[in-house]
Amino acid sequence: YGLFVCLLLWGGSELCCPQPLWFWQGGTRQPAPSVTPVVVECLEARLVVTVSRDLFGTGKLIQEADLSLGPEGCEPQASTDAVVRFEVGLHECGNSVQVTDDSLVYSSFLLHDPRPAGNLSILRTNRAEVPIECRYPRQGNVSSRAILPTWVPFWTTVLSEERLVFSLRLMEENWSREKMSPTFHLGDTAHLQAEVRTGSHPPLLLFVDRCVATPTRDQSGSPYHTIVDLHGCLVDGLSDGASKFKAPRPKPDVLQFMVAVFHFANDSRHTVYITCHLRVIPAQQAPDRLNKACSFNQSSSSWAPVEGSADICECCGNGDCDLIAGSPMNQNHAARSSLRSRRHVTEEADVTVGPLIFLGKAGDPAGTEGLASAAQATLVLGLRMATIVFLAVAAVVLGLTRGRHAASHPRSASQ
């Protein structure tokens, strides 16, 4: 009798008995079927709730019209004789979202609000509210799409894209290490290595877009000599076959090239600075007329790329490589000034190596004079810098001495 009253009041067995109810069927004692009444699926951007029509496990099936989802009371999308199904967006039906230290929590509820059937004024099931919650990690990937193998979260990848470090270095003849001495004789070949440090960035392919040589660090100064132009054409190779790109590359983010040593006529400084505009593209992108590394072969009078099809170098001969502007790029002062005026973005940068000191031919007295002149200029610059540093240190020491002297001999109020 007590169990019967409890069932009428609460409409369920779990509140009335500490153990599951057992019933008799066909003369044998069997446990009630253990069917999960509510199944929740938390998808990438949607919420799926499947409700058993035997919601209370009593054998009394609920009506589809008595079920709703969320504060806005969304109706079911599908139903069968056994289940009722909801499928909504995470932000729909008035669902709430909460941000914790490590999760995004979407909360909603399933409401069963029975109505009297027909003209009857009685209910055989109770009103019930089932809380629903979906948790998503804030530092993970919840997409069903494949993850690109950067192996870092998206925000880290974005930061690493802003930290590309471009460099241009003078190397030994065997490319094994950086050349420590900046001196050359006429007839030598300078070995230059352009490189970009990519960090956690996806693989990149580096190109030397343009290079210009000047006697000072001012890349727009005069006189000047163009080494690379037209988006990767090593035009210095037209006058000396030793000037060319090295193929194949050691790595996609490294590009090496040789330049036959020269000096500027009627210039007593015997120094040269080389400024190059470097740029990168995704490694999977094929080289084209705007992204290439082409050398001139004097024996065959033709241009050849380090990689890519041969036709991308054809424009080096006729000068129409600049597809964006729609016109050939002239080797003039304006073209060299664009090295400095172009916007510095993460995919490109200007880098300078120098000064390279040229001594003339080996054993040439004129070369010794040039070395003495260059060394004298370097010595004068060093002495000036040392004098400035000495004066600055002396001023700081003098100020500290005066401060300590004043602190150790304070004046009285009467004085």
UniProtKB/Swiss-Prot annotation:
Residues exposed to the Cytoplasmic side: 400-415
> What sections of the protein cross the membrane?
379-399
- Give the record's glycosylation annotations as residue positions: 28, 119, 141, 150, 156-157, 174, 266, 297
Instruction: Kindly give the SMART domains that the UniProt entry links to this protein.
Output: ZP
Name the keywords, alphabetized.
Answer: Cell membrane, Cleavage on pair of basic residues, Disulfide bond, Extracellular matrix, Fertilization, Glycoprotein, Membrane, Pyrrolidone carboxylic acid, Receptor, Secreted, Signal, Transmembrane, Transmembrane helix
Maturation propeptide residues: 342-415
Q: List the disulfide bonds.
A: 42-134, 74-93, 211-276, 233-294
Q: What biological-process GO terms show up in the record?
A: binding of sperm to zona pellucida; blastocyst formation; egg coat formation; humoral immune response mediated by circulating immunoglobulin; negative regulation of binding of sperm to zona pellucida; negative regulation of DNA-templated transcription; oocyte development; positive regulation of acrosomal vesicle exocytosis
Localization terms from the record: Cell membrane
Kindly list the GO molecular function terms attached to this UniProt entry: acrosin binding; carbohydrate binding; receptor ligand activity; structural constituent of egg coat
Q: Which residues carry this modification: Pyrrolidone carboxylic acid?
A: 19
Source organism's superkingdom? Eukaryota
Q: Which InterPro entries match?
A: ZP-C, ZP-C_dom, ZP-N, ZP_chr, ZP_dom, ZP_dom_CS
Which Pfam families does this chain map to? Zona_pellucida, ZP-N
Keyword rRNA processing on entry = no
Give the ZP domain ranges. 41-301
Cleaved signal peptide residues? 1-18
Q: How does it assemble?
A: Polymers of ZP2 and ZP3 organized into long filaments cross-linked by ZP1 homodimers. Interacts with ZP1 and ZP2.
Cross-referenced PANTHER family: ZONA PELLUCIDA SPERM-BINDING PROTEIN 3
| Family recorded in the similarity comment | Belongs to the ZP domain family. ZPC subfamily.
Q: What does this protein do?
A: Component of the zona pellucida, an extracellular matrix surrounding oocytes which mediates sperm binding, induction of the acrosome reaction and prevents post-fertilization polyspermy. The zona pellucida is composed of 3 to 4 glycoproteins, ZP1, ZP2, ZP3, and ZP4. ZP3 is essential for sperm binding and zona matrix formation.
Protein name (record):
Zona pellucida sperm-binding protein 3
Give the source species.
Oryctolagus cuniculus
Instruction: Write the gene name.
Output: ZP3
